[in-house]
């Protein structure tokens, strides 16, 4: 006899019941080693050996289980009462106490069952699932099986026997033939006293008088094996009994003859009307082994005579249970493994428990699997719950379910892959020890709007779904009761990133409530079948690039098969069609990926075949049509495919069309290769001349050919996109993955990469990585989103808008969030990629409106366009945009809206609003809004630079005038990219927690005190350090933010993350952010930084960072912690990488400047000075002087002629000069100047360069501009100080004769200052009017910068401007004293001597002598005067 390892046997006292597995295939009786395990425990408890009775007729052991009607125990066995007395005599005092404890527990349970007898739900349901609560003394006995096992350890008392008899299986072998068994049973009943309570328990369905309602169920008997290692450790160690069973072939054959064959699984067990006192007839259980591993695990066990166990099987009058069993098909597991969303099969497990139970002789005992407390649902809408304490769960029930850290999510009760909806799901299925861990009851659900994800949820984590309003009421109650920060309230609030999906799930669940229960499951699967289909269409093109395209491309383009057609028989591989029956193992509610409508096409040999997924023709022509790996690896082929795909698809995604294009492009590629081979062959044969043929082959095989084709297709596509839209398009808005089909798959960035590798990758990024893949479509002026249903306003504004957004604007409803809007998707009726159009005739029932026009809200109400900065018509008077200080006389002019003079703009702005936007120009003659210059490129001189657009376009913020180049190096970090021309800059969407984060020291002097904090960044300064008047009621914007210089991607910054100190970090571009960091919740305009010295990353906003500059060392607070060591390492790394990044950025700036030439701001070009009232020019001809130069001189009135007018700096008047037209002293009037050009000189700004040599004393150019008096000069200086404009063009001639070349002038206004200039200014009198000319003071070679000394004394209120002339004697300040080279050399030599002497001599500190202050060189000290 073989003992297997998968059965279960338990021995309690003298009664033994177990499950023996009979393998009908091998005809061998198998049992489990649990029999041995149970016997070992019994022996360990008793401490004595018990002999197994042997048959007197032969020496073979007695079989444990036999046919019904046969009793392996002889009729002469001693009765149960005598056996009980013998057992009680062998009991120890400890065992008696345990027996008394068990009896007390049983009595308490019977009393509780008696109290529950009055409930009609209890009658007929006294079984293993009855809701009998445990007593305090039995709190450690969790399950039925453990209670039976513990009772087996205490089976030495009569009460233990009674408990064992009560818990015995109704299939315990009865007496043989019915005679002896009846006598034994009647004798036992006659000796047992039954109280009225016990009779009432029997009447209400208890299985025995002492029934506890916790008898072992069928699952406890045959399904889950139990290993008793944990129990053995708690028992007393005694020598184990050696169990051996030996069956010869004769006995084995006899057992096979007497065993009962198992009936079909679907057969119901019949019940008979026999009395409950009759003997129970049992049938051997035959269960087919599922795996061959169980046969291999079977071992032979023999029973030796010296160590035998005595098994006394007593005939008990046991009550049976009527069981109706319906098993699921055997192939259920296979079908559920293959299908993701398989419909539940029409099978169930129903357990009907009735009292009093009977079993007929023909009934079969079959072990069933059911949960210990709640039965398995049938997966057809039935939910059979035997426990009235548990709720009823039905397929299609809607709940709010909570798993892990997610909030409560709408879900629906669905069957799991095994067909269960309720069951025990142990947290540790591999655990085999018998500890006291509780196994929870869980319900299987699937979640809405979550791609059909499923999970098992505990009932306490389920809430009944009654709509969103009821959920909000419940959540509000929890908030009032526990507070908004409590865990109970937070688990009912979804995260910000999940709100949209959460509301979508609520909508789906709400729609499911309108569907009957019988159709909910099918509807659920249909919904997510569409989701799976859409996800399949969004796969990357590289996944199906190498797939066969014969089913689509070849069927539509049969003529292309003749390119590589070969003779021969064509094979047809036909696949078996998938069954459409929902009960079939191969059924799937989700259509197969290759399942399409079969098409009829003719093969080349004239036969017809079906092509498609079900029957696919594999032909040589189709095989060669498919793109092979060699062709796809060719870059020319990839470029050709990308160009054609972009031209045809137009940012759409259609798997069918793309497969067709792949087939067509492959055929075009094959044709081109054939033509190239023919050209090469003709060239080799000499039919074509070699120079011509080589050039043709070279041009045809180069990548430039594909590039030219791509440019032409791109031009055609742009022209087509610029055509006016008559009707809204029905194509859906492309999603982000669809637009990036041409991109290579992104590689996941690991978190713990070295910082050197990260910075190297950042420096290698191109200038367009932020704009790659963005849409070029316009966006709505209200919701800032693109879409296929955009319509242009029919009025003058010509803005784009959605119809529903216009309705929201009119009604005041909130606009949809960016990214949440879905395009209108109208399913096409044809398979062509072009949208369908309805054919309208005169007899059509409905009139189709063509060209529906919309008018935006502002145009409709006649509201004038407001300021581009404050978005208001009248100038605001708020602290964020204060008025100018001098507002007494010029308030009406400054409050007026100025219109931008740039072409194709027309934006209007207030002069007062330009205070924080220095990129704008508020000049009356040339007003310019801040949206025409890149704020990053002109940040060092916002008001003095103006960059011509050229080929570099601009991306503009939709909420403010911020404008940047369409280059990744110019876009600030955290910018929200809407499309290629519209962005949302980081100034917006600032969280409340980041609104007031500033440093505690002055950014200029690095000291504390009373600070003025910037409103847009963490910088704080002292008011006296900034040297500007700041009112208490107005906000302060620092110079960095005002100039538009925001932190960029790849720059090093100081970052304040949570409560940590300011830490050096680098801003990571979006392409370098690790994938796990991307999944973290963050704000709309946040960006990721990596902290130096660590591998930590974090999302952070603009308000928590400021630029790291050279020389920063951090705070000096030193500790010995690991955090401080990481901080020190981070500061060192930041200081080491800062010059590398700055050098790389300077190289990029030089490359950009070489491509896009910078130009100064526009100005009015004039030739002569213009007087500004009240100043006027007056000519007095009496003051004219004449010279003595004659026309016969070599150079009349020249520099060497000794002309009197030239020596007096007067220009000769042609009417009075004797030289006439030959006079050379007419530079100003004739404007004789060399060829000059304005060039950008980096940190020096714009400068003037000569393009031809200039000799010493030559006239260069006249300095012209507006001539103003001193009062006007003071007013303009104050205006420049308010505007923070440090570009001065004033040249003072006299007190009331000052030339201002700022608004009007010529090229002389671009000449820079130099401490060692090559030109100088001279005041000349021309026709009795003072004019200023610039003359060379040295020979100037070609391409040299022309400079002169500004001679500023006190122009900027005792403040000096830095000088960048680079001269040897440069003072460092404009207008400062020059440094003497000799003095500097002498000081350096003296310092070297002192250093050398200090090495050999010891210095003694000299006594301090009082210093005498000399007022002048002629003054003497006071001591000398006294003497």
Swiss-Prot record:
<keyword id="KW-0156">Chromatin regulator</keyword>
<feature type="compositionally biased region" description="Low complexity">
    <location>
        <begin position="89"/>
        <end position="100"/>
    </location>
</feature>
<keyword id="KW-0539">Nucleus</keyword>
<feature type="compositionally biased region" description="Polar residues">
    <location>
        <begin position="604"/>
        <end position="630"/>
    </location>
</feature>
<feature type="modified residue" description="Phosphoserine">
    <location>
        <position position="581"/>
    </location>
</feature>
<dbReference type="InterPro" id="IPR019786">
    <property type="entry name" value="Zinc_finger_PHD-type_CS"/>
</dbReference>
<dbReference type="GO" id="GO:0046975">
    <property type="term" value="F:histone H3K36 methyltransferase activity"/>
</dbReference>
<dbReference type="GO" id="GO:0000228">
    <property type="term" value="C:nuclear chromosome"/>
</dbReference>
<comment type="similarity">
    <text>Belongs to the class V-like SAM-binding methyltransferase superfamily. Histone-lysine methyltransferase family. SET2 subfamily.</text>
</comment>
<feature type="compositionally biased region" description="Polar residues">
    <location>
        <begin position="21"/>
        <end position="31"/>
    </location>
</feature>
<dbReference type="GO" id="GO:0005721">
    <property type="term" value="C:pericentric heterochromatin"/>
</dbReference>
<comment type="function">
    <text>Probable histone methyltransferase. Histone methylation gives specific tags for epigenetic transcriptional activation or repression.</text>
</comment>
<feature type="compositionally biased region" description="Basic residues">
    <location>
        <begin position="594"/>
        <end position="603"/>
    </location>
</feature>
<feature type="domain" description="PWWP 2">
    <location>
        <begin position="1049"/>
        <end position="1111"/>
    </location>
</feature>
<dbReference type="GO" id="GO:0031490">
    <property type="term" value="F:chromatin DNA binding"/>
</dbReference>
<keyword id="KW-0808">Transferase</keyword>
<dbReference type="InterPro" id="IPR006560">
    <property type="entry name" value="AWS_dom"/>
</dbReference>
<dbReference type="GO" id="GO:0045944">
    <property type="term" value="P:positive regulation of transcription by RNA polymerase II"/>
</dbReference>
<dbReference type="GO" id="GO:0000785">
    <property type="term" value="C:chromatin"/>
</dbReference>
<feature type="zinc finger region" description="PHD-type 3">
    <location>
        <begin position="999"/>
        <end position="1044"/>
    </location>
</feature>
<feature type="domain" description="SET">
    <location>
        <begin position="1234"/>
        <end position="1351"/>
    </location>
</feature>
<dbReference type="InterPro" id="IPR050777">
    <property type="entry name" value="SET2_Histone-Lys_MeTrsfase"/>
</dbReference>
<feature type="modified residue" description="Phosphothreonine">
    <location>
        <position position="723"/>
    </location>
</feature>
<feature type="modified residue" description="Phosphoserine">
    <location>
        <position position="169"/>
    </location>
</feature>
<feature type="compositionally biased region" description="Basic and acidic residues">
    <location>
        <begin position="1"/>
        <end position="15"/>
    </location>
</feature>
<keyword id="KW-0677">Repeat</keyword>
<feature type="zinc finger region" description="PHD-type 1">
    <location>
        <begin position="777"/>
        <end position="862"/>
    </location>
</feature>
<keyword id="KW-0862">Zinc</keyword>
<dbReference type="GO" id="GO:0140954">
    <property type="term" value="F:histone H3K36 dimethyltransferase activity"/>
</dbReference>
<dbReference type="GO" id="GO:0005700">
    <property type="term" value="C:polytene chromosome"/>
</dbReference>
<feature type="compositionally biased region" description="Basic and acidic residues">
    <location>
        <begin position="736"/>
        <end position="746"/>
    </location>
</feature>
<keyword id="KW-0863">Zinc-finger</keyword>
<dbReference type="InterPro" id="IPR046341">
    <property type="entry name" value="SET_dom_sf"/>
</dbReference>
<dbReference type="InterPro" id="IPR019787">
    <property type="entry name" value="Znf_PHD-finger"/>
</dbReference>
<dbReference type="InterPro" id="IPR001214">
    <property type="entry name" value="SET_dom"/>
</dbReference>
<dbReference type="InterPro" id="IPR013083">
    <property type="entry name" value="Znf_RING/FYVE/PHD"/>
</dbReference>
<feature type="region of interest" description="Disordered">
    <location>
        <begin position="249"/>
        <end position="280"/>
    </location>
</feature>
<feature type="modified residue" description="Phosphoserine">
    <location>
        <position position="158"/>
    </location>
</feature>
<dbReference type="GO" id="GO:0005634">
    <property type="term" value="C:nucleus"/>
</dbReference>
<dbReference type="GO" id="GO:0042464">
    <property type="term" value="P:dosage compensation by hypoactivation of X chromosome"/>
</dbReference>
<dbReference type="GO" id="GO:0042054">
    <property type="term" value="F:histone methyltransferase activity"/>
</dbReference>
<dbReference type="Pfam" id="PF00855">
    <property type="entry name" value="PWWP"/>
</dbReference>
């Amino acid at each position: 006899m073989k003992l297997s390892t998968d059965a279960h046997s338990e021995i309690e006292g003298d009664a033994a019941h177990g499950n023996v597995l009979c393998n009908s295939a091998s005809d061998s009786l198998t049992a489990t080693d649990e029999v041995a395990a149970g016997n070992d425990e019994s022996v360990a408890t008793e401490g004595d050996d018990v002999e197994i009775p042997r048959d007197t007729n032969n020496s073979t052991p007695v079989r444990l289980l036999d046919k019904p009607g046969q009793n392996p125990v002889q009729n002469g066995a001693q009765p149960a009462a005598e056996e009980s007395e013998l057992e009680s005599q062998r009991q120890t005092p400890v065992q008696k106490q345990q027996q008394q404890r068990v009896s007390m527990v049983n009595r308490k349970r019977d009393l509780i069952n008696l109290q529950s007898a009055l409930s009609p739900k209890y009658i007929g349901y006294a079984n293993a699932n009855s809701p009998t609560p445990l007593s305090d003394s039995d709190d450690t006995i969790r399950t039925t099986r453990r209670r039976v096992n513990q009772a087996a350890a205490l089976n030495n008392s009569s009460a233990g026997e009674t408990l064992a008899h009560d818990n015995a299986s109704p299939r315990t072998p009865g007496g043989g033939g019915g005679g002896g068994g009846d006598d034994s049973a009647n004798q036992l009943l006659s000796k047992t006293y039954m109280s009225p309570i016990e009779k009432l328990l029997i009447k209400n369905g208890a299985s025995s008088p002492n029934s506890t309602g916790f008898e072992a169920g069928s699952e406890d008997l045959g399904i889950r094996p139990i290993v008793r290692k944990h129990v053995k450790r708690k028992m007393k160690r005694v020598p184990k009994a050696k169990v051996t069973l030996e069956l010869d072939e004769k006995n084995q054959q006899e057992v096979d003859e007497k065993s009962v064959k198992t009936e079909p699984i679907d057969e119901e067990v019949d019940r008979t009307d026999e009395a409950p006192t009759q003997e129970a007839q049992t049938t051997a259980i035959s269960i087919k082994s599922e795996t061959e591993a169980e046969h291999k695990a079977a071992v032979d066990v023999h029973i030796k005579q010296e160590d035998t166990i005595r098994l006394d099987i007593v005939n008990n009058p046991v009550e049976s249970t009527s069981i109706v069993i319906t098993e699921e098909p055997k192939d259920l597991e296979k079908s559920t493994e293959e299908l993701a969303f398989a419909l539940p099969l029409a099978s169930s497990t129903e357990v009907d428990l009735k009292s009093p139970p009977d079993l007929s002789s023909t009934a079969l005992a079959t072990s069933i699997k059911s949960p210990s407390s709640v039965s398995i649902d049938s997966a057809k809408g039935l939910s059979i719950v035997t426990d009235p304490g548990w709720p009823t769960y039905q397929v299609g029930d809607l709940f709010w379910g909570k798993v892990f850290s997610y909030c409560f999510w709408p879900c629906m009760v669905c069957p799991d892959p095994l067909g269960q909806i309720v069951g025990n799901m142990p947290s540790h299925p591999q655990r085999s020890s018998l500890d006291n861990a509780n196994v929870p009851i869980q319900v299987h659900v699937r979640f809405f709007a979550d791609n059909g994800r499923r999970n098992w949820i505990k009932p306490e984590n389920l809430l009944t779904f009654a709509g969103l309003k009821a959920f909000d009421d419940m959540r509000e109650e929890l908030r009032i009761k526990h507070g908004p920060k409590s865990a109970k309230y937070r688990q009912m609030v979804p995260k910000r990133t999940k709100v949209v999906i959460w509301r979508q799930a609520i909508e789906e669940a709400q729609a499911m409530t309108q569907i009957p229960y019988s159709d909910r499951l099918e509807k659920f699967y249909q919904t997510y079948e569409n989701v799976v289909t859409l996800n399949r269409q969004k796969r990357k093109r590289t996944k199906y690039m190498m797939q066969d395209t014969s089913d689509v491309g070849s069927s539509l383009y049969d003529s292309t098969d003749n390119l590589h057609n070969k003779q021969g028989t064509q094979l047809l591989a036909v696949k078996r069609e998938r069954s459409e029956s929902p009960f079939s193992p191969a059924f799937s509610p989700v259509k197969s990926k290759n399942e399409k409508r079969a098409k009829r096409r003719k093969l080349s040999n004239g036969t017809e075949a079906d092509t498609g997924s079900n029957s696919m023709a594999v032909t040589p022509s189709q095989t060669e049509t498919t793109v092979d790996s060699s062709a796809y690896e060719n870059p020319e082929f990839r470029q050709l495919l990308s160009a054609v795909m972009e031209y045809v698809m137009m940012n759409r995604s259609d798997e069918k069309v793309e497969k067709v294009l792949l087939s067509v492009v492959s055929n075009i590629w094959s044709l081109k290769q054939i033509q190239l081979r023919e050209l090469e062959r003709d060239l080799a044969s000499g039919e074509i001349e070699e120079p011509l043929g080589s050039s043709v082959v070279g041009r045809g095989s180069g990548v430039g050919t594909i590039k030219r084709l791509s440019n032409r297709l791109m031009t055609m596509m742009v022209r087509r996109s610029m055509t006016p839209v008559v009707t809204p398009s029905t194509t859906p808005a492309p999603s982000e993955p669809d637009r990036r089909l041409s991109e290579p798959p992104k590689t996941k960035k690991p978190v713990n990469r070295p910082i050197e590798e990260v910075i190297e990758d950042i420096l290698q990024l191109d200038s367009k990585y932020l704009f790659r893949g963005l849409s070029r479509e316009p966006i709505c002026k209200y919701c800032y989103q693109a879409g296929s249903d955009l319509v242009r306003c029919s009025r003058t504004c010509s803005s784009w808008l959605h119809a529903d957004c216009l309705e929201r604007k009119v009604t005041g409803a909130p606009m949809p969030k960016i990214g949440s809007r879905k395009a209108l998707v109208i399913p096409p009726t044809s398979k062509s990629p072009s949208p369908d159009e309805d054919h309208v005739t005169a007899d059509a029932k409905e009139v189709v409106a063509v060209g529906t026009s919309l008018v935006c809200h502002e145009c409709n109400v006649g509201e004038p366009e407001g300021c581009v900065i404050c978005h208001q018509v009248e100038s605001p008077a708020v602290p964020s945009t204060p008025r100018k200080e001098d507002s007494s006389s010029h308030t009406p002019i400054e409050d007026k809206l100025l219109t931008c003079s740039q072409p194709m703009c027309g934006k209007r702005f207030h002069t007062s609003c330009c205070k924080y936007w220095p990129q704008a120009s508020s000049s009356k003659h040339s007003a310019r809004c801040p949206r025409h210059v890149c704020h990053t490129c002109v940040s060092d001189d916002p008001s003095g630079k103006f960059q011509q657009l050229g080929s570099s376009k601009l991306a503009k913020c939709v909420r403010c005038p911020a404008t940047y180049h369409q280059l990744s190096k110019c876009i600030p970090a955290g910018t929200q990219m809407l499309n290629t021309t519209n962005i949302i800059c980081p100034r917006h969407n600032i969280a409340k927690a980041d609104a007031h984060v500033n440093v505690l020291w002055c950014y200029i002097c690095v000291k504390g005190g009373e600070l003025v904090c910037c409103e847009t960044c963490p910088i704080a300064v002292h008011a006296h350090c900034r040297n500007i008047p700041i009112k208490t009621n107005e906000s302060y914007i620092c110079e960095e933010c005002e100039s538009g210089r925001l932190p960029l991607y790849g720059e090093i910054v100081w970052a304040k993350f949570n409560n940590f100190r300011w830490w050096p970090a680098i801003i990571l571009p979006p392409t370098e952010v690790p994938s796990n960091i991307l999944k973290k919740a963050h704000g709309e305009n946040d960006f990721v930084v990596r902290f130096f010295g660590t591998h930590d990353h974090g999302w952070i906003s603009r308000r928590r960072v400021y630029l790291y500059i050279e020389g920063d060392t951090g705070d000096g607070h030193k500790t010995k912690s690991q955090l401080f060591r990481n901080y020190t390492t981070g500061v060192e790394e930041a200081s080491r990488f800062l010059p590398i990044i700055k050098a790389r950025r300077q190289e990029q700036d030089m490359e950009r400047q070489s491509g896009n030439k910078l130009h100064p701001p526009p100005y009015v070009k004039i030739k002569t000075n213009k007087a500004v009232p009240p100043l006027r020019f007056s000519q007095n001809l009496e003051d004219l002087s004449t010279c003595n130069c004659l026309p016969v001189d070599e150079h009349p009135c020249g520099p060497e002629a000794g002309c009197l007018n030239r020596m007096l700096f007067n220009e000769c008047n042609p009417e009075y000069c004797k030289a006439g037209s030959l006079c050379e002293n007419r530079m100003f009037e004739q404007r004789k100047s060399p060829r000059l050009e304005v060039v950008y000189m980096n940190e020096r700004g714009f400068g003037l360069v000569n393009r031809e040599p200039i000799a010493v004393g030559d006239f260069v150019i006249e300095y012209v501009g507006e001539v103003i008096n001193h009062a006007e000069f003071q007013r303009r200086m104050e205006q420049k100080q308010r505007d923070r404009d440090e570009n001065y063009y004033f040249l003072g001639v006299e007190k009331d004769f000052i030339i201002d070349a700022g608004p009007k002038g010529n090229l002389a206004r671009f000449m820079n200052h130099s401490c060692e200039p090559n030109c100088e200014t001279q005041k000349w009198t021309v026709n009795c009017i003072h004019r200023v000319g610039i003359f060379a003071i040295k020979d100037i070679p070609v391409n040299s910068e022309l400079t002169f000394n500004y001679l500023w004394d006190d122009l900027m209120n005792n403040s000096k401007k830095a000088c960048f002339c680079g001269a040897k004697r440069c003072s460092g300040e404009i207008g400062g004293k020059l440094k003497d080279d000799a003095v500097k050399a002498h000081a350096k030599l003296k310092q070297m001597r002192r250093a050398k002497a200090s090495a050999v001599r010891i210095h003694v500190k000299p006594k301090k002598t009082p210093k005498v202050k000399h007022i002048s060189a002629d003054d003497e000290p006071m001591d000398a005067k006294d003497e």
